[in-house]
């Protein structure tokens, strides 16, 4: 079964400990020794699931997790939920007890086959009385079905395999099997690569590029194989229409895309000149993490089209856009040829049809200049200034992962000058903070040197990720913004009496030394004294061959007020009004 998965594209397996899963462990080890897959181990199934999800997201190809029976399977649910909502392939393989032991009080025997069903694209099972010899064709078919469902509409797939005892062959049996096994033997693969392309059975709706409009690019949720065609289609439509682009940091837009308004988050709601009443909105993927943008989109009166990369589920919380799931590249191809040709005899495309592009560009550049004045790169660290500095100091094209709380929002607002220079990741399908470190380690395993920007609670929540970091030695710089609790709650209209109740009920600061915790896992650590030291600290962290932790202490209350003051100052700026 594993060999069939490998021949379809499986490259990496994450193995968790267990006895019932022993046959799967031995099979995976055999493929690893033959050089067919790579293998890593993790004692925490929740961490393993997120690590595999990070690898899948970075590579665009499903990574597999193998677990034993019982609560081990339940611990895969958080990663499966995120894989489902963010449309990423994730293969979850669990060993189980045979049917004869179910619902009889047998040890470590639960109805695990149903645990992941609500969020999986497909759930497959081996024979309920246990796997046995002579089932090669059935297992190959099971593997092929799993791989097809993983990538046809990307998401999690669960294979539950009951095993009857005896579970563990002796050394002579193992030696005999591997000596006769043919690692190059191929099976008939019925998987069709075309199934991995976004599809829609409806005719593609059109917009009018000769009329005013705006492009809103949300988080990219397609496979790596479809990213380049997506980017090419995005460039083509923007060149044809001249529309401005408001892009989420996770949108994976190309660096040569025209019309990008980088500081839209700080310019909204009053810093962008009003669109004509009939302006169209082309929305790509899910909504960016901005309530200001969501409110602004809701106020637009013209036609709206939402295009997803193969996800047919409703993705418009505003319920005002027509949705099409065939993918942007296919949409561009299906447009009337007349709509895909720029007429050189017409006036400059930025001036046609009341396009606001030039005015928005001017406001964007002026706001960026104001940020240089308002956020100097020296003195004590604060979160807006830190993000603004990181956008300039981090090497271009170095991947960045942003924890799904304050970091992704602050990057969107204050690191906007970085838009299009690098791939940014943040797992906002379900927007949980669990698995943050493990996800980043998975990304680094696939892409090489990576930076994780996280808060203290998100890092502590996945502290078992340090076990993976210590063992795998991935080149990951963890930049910890330690503001003693949940800083995101300081930015919400939450009031408590007395004030101390806010910490107890919402911020929940923890009395843990993150430097000591990382050092206990043999992770090199460093504390940032001030913003002046940031360049040398980044050089230290990025110069390491393995994981490192750089801690930056900030004040969440004063930083929340600073954000409000910055937005007010920028909105009141004469040059931007």
UniProtKB/Swiss-Prot annotation:
Pfam families: TPP_enzyme_C (PF02775), TPP_enzyme_M_2 (PF16582), TPP_enzyme_N (PF02776). Disulfide bonds: none annotated. It catalyses: isochorismate + 2-oxoglutarate + H(+) = 5-enolpyruvoyl-6-hydroxy-2-succinyl-cyclohex-3-ene-1-carboxylate + CO2. Its cofactor is Mg(2+); Mn(2+); thiamine diphosphate. The keyword Manganese applies. The keyword Transferase applies. Keywords: Magnesium, Manganese, Metal-binding, Thiamine pyrophosphate, Transferase. PANTHER family: 2-SUCCINYL-5-ENOLPYRUVYL-6-HYDROXY-3-CYCLOHEXENE-1-CARBOXYLATE SYNTHASE (PTHR42916), PROTEIN PHYLLO, CHLOROPLASTIC (PTHR42916:SF1). Catalyzes the thiamine diphosphate-dependent decarboxylation of 2-oxoglutarate and the subsequent addition of the resulting succinic semialdehyde-thiamine pyrophosphate anion to isochorismate to yield 2-succinyl-5-enolpyruvyl-6-hydroxy-3-cyclohexene-1-carboxylate (SEPHCHC). This is 2-succinyl-5-enolpyruvyl-6-hydroxy-3-cyclohexene-1-carboxylate synthase. It comes from Synechococcus sp. (strain CC9311).
């Amino acid at each position: 079964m594993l060999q069939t998965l490998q021949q379809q594209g499986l490259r990496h397996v994450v193995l968790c400990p267990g006895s019932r899963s022993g046959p799967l462990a031995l099979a995976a080890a055999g493929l690893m020794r033959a050089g067919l897959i790579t293998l890593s181990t993790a004692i925490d199934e929740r961490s393993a699931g997120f690590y595999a999800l990070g690898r899948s997201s970075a590579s665009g190809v499903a990574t597999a997790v193998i677990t034993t029976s019982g609560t081990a399977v339940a611990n895969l649910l958080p990663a499966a939920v995120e894989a489902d909502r963010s449309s990423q392939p994730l293969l979850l393989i669990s060993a189980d007890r045979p049917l004869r032991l179910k619902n009889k009080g047998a040890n470590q025997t639960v109805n695990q086959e149903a645990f992941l069903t609500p969020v999986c694209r497909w759930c497959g099972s081996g024979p309920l009385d246990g796997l046995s010899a002579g089932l090669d064709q059935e297992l190959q078919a099971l593997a092929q079905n799993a791989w097809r469902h993983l990538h046809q509409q990307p998401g999690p797939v669960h294979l539950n395999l009951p095993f009857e005892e005896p579970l563990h062959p002796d050394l002579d049996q193992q030696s005999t099997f591997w000596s006769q096994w043919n690692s190059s033997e191929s099976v008939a693969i019925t998987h069709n690569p075309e199934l991995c392309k976004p599809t829609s059975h409806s005719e593609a709706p059109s917009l009018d590029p000769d009329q005013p409009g705006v492009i809103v690019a949300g988080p990219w949720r397609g496979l790596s194989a479809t990213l380049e065609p997506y980017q090419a289609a995005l460039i083509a439509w923007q060149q044809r229409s001249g529309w401005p682009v408001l892009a989420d940091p996770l949108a994976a837009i190309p660096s040569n895309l025209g019309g990008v308004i980088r500081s839209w988050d700080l310019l909204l709601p009053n810093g962008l000149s009003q669109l004509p009443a009939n302006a169209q909105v082309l929305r790509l993927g899910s909504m960016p993490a901005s309530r200001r943008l969501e409110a602004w989109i809701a106020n637009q009166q013209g036609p709206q089209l939402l295009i997803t990369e193969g996800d047919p589920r409703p993705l418009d919380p505003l319920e005002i856009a027509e949705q099409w799931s065939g993918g942007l590249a296919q949409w561009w191809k299906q447009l009337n040829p007349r709509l895909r040709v720029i007429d050189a005899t017409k006036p400059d495309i930025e001036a046609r049809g009341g396009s606001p592009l030039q005015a928005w560009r001017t406001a964007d550049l002026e706001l960026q200049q104001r940020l240089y004045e308002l956020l100097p790169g020296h003195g004590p660290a604060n979160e807006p200034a830190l993000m603004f500095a990181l956008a300039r100091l981090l090497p271009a094209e170095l991947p960045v992962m942003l924890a799904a709380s304050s970091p992704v929002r602050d990057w969107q607002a204050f690191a906007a000058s970085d838009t299009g220079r690098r791939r940014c990741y943040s797992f906002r399908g379900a927007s949980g903070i669990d698995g943050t470190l493990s996800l980043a380690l998975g990304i680094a395993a696939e892409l090489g040197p990576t930076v994780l920007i996280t808060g203290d609670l998100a890092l502590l929540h996945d502290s078992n990720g340090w076990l993976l970091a210590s063992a795998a030695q991935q080149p990951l710089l963890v930049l910890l913004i330690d503001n003693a609790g949940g800083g995101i709650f300081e930015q919400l209209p939450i009031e408590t009496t007395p004030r101390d109740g806010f910490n107890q009920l919402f911020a929940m600061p923890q009395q843990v030394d993150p430097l000591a915790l990382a050092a206990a896992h043999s992770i090199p650590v460093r504390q940032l004294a001030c913003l002046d030291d940031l360049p040398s600290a980044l050089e230290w962290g990025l110069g390491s061959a393995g994981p490192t932790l750089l801690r930056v202490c900030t004040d969440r209350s004063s930083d929340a007020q600073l954000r409000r003051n910055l937005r007010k100052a920028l909105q009141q700026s004469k040059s931007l009004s």
